[in-house]
Amino acid sequence: MNKIIKENTFEINDKKYIILGIKNAVVNNEIFQLNKKFEFQMINADYIATIEHIKHAILQAMTKKNISNNFWVEILVRASATRQIATAIKLLGAKSGDVCLICNDEETANIIIDKIGGIVQKNSVEFLDVPNDVNNEKFKKIVELYGLKNVNSSKELVKRVLEEIAIIECKV
């Protein structure tokens, strides 16, 4: 497991973030009680366009113009491209199924993985990427969630989602 965690650790503004794709996780309310002890965020992976989507949300959460006073909640808010915490939770909050786990340390990652089960993906980048197929279910879900029009490729989809996240910074 530690090898998978190391391979899915990314440096963003001189700080390390573990970004894991987990298939078939079981998410219940108990897991969210761990937010009081551990720093992490889980996002519904069905609506993540690419790992760059998560990295961009993390970068935006590092700004001084935050919507939430909790950095980890801010990541969810930014990833959802909304200014409302409740809306962000409704749109991208983790549910049982495929999730993206974001945290800073291996201990937290291992504790969360033990609680939610599922299959940790060896390559989170590949797992989170939306297929380049406009008829793909994940592609359609993301287009609908962000209200995008005339999107014909995954590259264009990712660009437009990142733009939606950036626009939030202008509104804060």
Give, region by region, the residue ranges found by the protein language model.
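Secreted/extracellular ectodomain signature
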Residues: 1-13
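Phenylalanine-focused residue identity feature
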Residues: 10, 38-40, 71, 127, ...
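Short flexible coil/turn linkers enriched for glycine and charged/polar residues
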Residues: 13-16, 94-96
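N-terminal interaction modules that seed assembly of large macromolecular complexes
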Residues: 15-70
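Low-complexity, intrinsically disordered regions enriched in charged/polar residues
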Residues: 48, 52, 79-82, 133-136, ...
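Ordered, amphipathic secondary-structure segments that act as subunit-interaction surfaces
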Residues: 51-109
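Glycine-rich, aromatic-bearing surface loops/beta-hairpins
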Residues: 94-172
